[in-house]
Amino acid sequence: MAGTEVTDSYGRRTVFQGSLLISDTTDTDDERKPQWLDIDIWRTNGGSYVVQKAVRYRVAHAIATCGRLGGYEIRDATEADTFRCPGCNPNGDRHSSWGQESRIAVDVYSSPEQLIESLKVDGKLTRLSRALLADLSEQDGRIDELWNTVVVD
């Protein structure tokens, strides 16, 4: 089956046919954030939603076992890793050899209700979630119906 293939941090592949509804980032044009989120949302030809969230980093670590890594994968540091880790190299006087790999999650939701619920943090929609839903509602009638219509008893 030809189509779109996305892979999470564990190597699990999700393959589907559909269209990209939104691709957004919390990064800035001047790349001044040490950590940011990239999010892509597709609607499959069958009507499900595929969400890929990638937490990305520009932090250089001096110690491969730095506690701020939280057990996540590391890689060789690159020129893009412009922020020194405040935990293992706060003064910048140690050579920073390691960068943190992106953490990528891929989830599939069978309904717009499930998708909207998945965008909540601690049971509430964040500013980012609301902006995503506003953009998504312009492209998907099912999301528009749920998101832009509030029914009050």
Put a short name on every predicted segment.
Residues 44-52, 69-72:
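Amphipathic alpha-helical interaction modules
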Residues 31-35, 57-58, 145, 150-153:
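Exposed acidic/polar residues on beta-strands and adjacent loops within beta-sheet cores, strongest
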